[in-house]
Amino acid sequence: MRRITCLTREDETDCEPEDVLRRIETAKKSAHSVIKEIRKSRDVKRTLKVHMEPWGDLCLHEYRWNLKRVVLSPFRISKGRKIWVYYEGLRRKNISVPEPVFFLEIKVLFVVIRTYIATRWIAEGTKLSQLAAKKDIRPDHFRTILCKCVNAVINLHESGFVHGDLKWSNLLIVPGKDAVVFTDIDALRKTSDPLSQCKDFARIFRPPSRCRLDSGTAEMMILQYLSGRSSLGDPLLEKRLRFYIARQKSRRNDQFL
């Protein structure tokens, strides 16, 4: 038996779940663009830019079931629901992520087979990877942006979260705002484990193709992170952090000067 759960954040959009699902299917057919698509055996993740009334332009994330995951952990919370649940806690901690406007989950018996979560489209933001690729960006200006990114990660970790995929393309810089927006947050999880947080931070030291991170700037970022993380005063933790960063560096030797 199929059961649909739909949650919205605005009173004026109190819609029936079946109606929201119909709107989703219509929006998918006329999507503005496919931002990301991952297809594995019995597992699909898609991110689309769509337009849906009354919300306007949205970033729609679709997750379809994975048989292996269902068998291993049938009662595990879905990625979409996790984003929905975490949002208010993140907002209270001044951690910027795209604002979710609705969440829809389809279950057959007790098994989640499909999840949708829609977030507001951020039109004015630029990915860190796109900024790094600009030839006319001043080095001192880019270092300032990197410092903002490190501060955002410090706040995320001090609040007891790890992002799970801190690629440069998942850090959105919004002009005129101090906040750095974390995107693609379906790997986000709660943990205060310092080793997990060190691994999370180390991922930012693996820049994308054709981008460069000089050793002086990298060291500045490391010291800034350690200074902002009072819980990482243990020299052994600093050693582990540098080990994780060196491992990321070895995967992209040509990206470090």
Predicted regions and their residues:
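Juxta-kinase regulatory segment immediately upstream of eukaryotic protein kinase catalytic domains
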Residues: 1-37, 244
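Conserved ATP-binding subdomain of kinase catalytic cores across diverse folds
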Residues: 25-126, 148, 154, 158
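Residue-level marker of alpha-helix boundaries and capping positions
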Residues: 77-78, 143, 212
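AlphaC helix of the protein kinase catalytic domain
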Residues: 127-137
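Conserved short alpha-helix within the protein kinase catalytic core
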Residues: 139, 143-150
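Catalytic-loop of the protein kinase fold
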Residues: 158-168
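Conserved protein kinase catalytic/activation segment
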Residues: 170-182
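C-lobe/activation-segment region of protein kinase-like
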Residues: 181-257
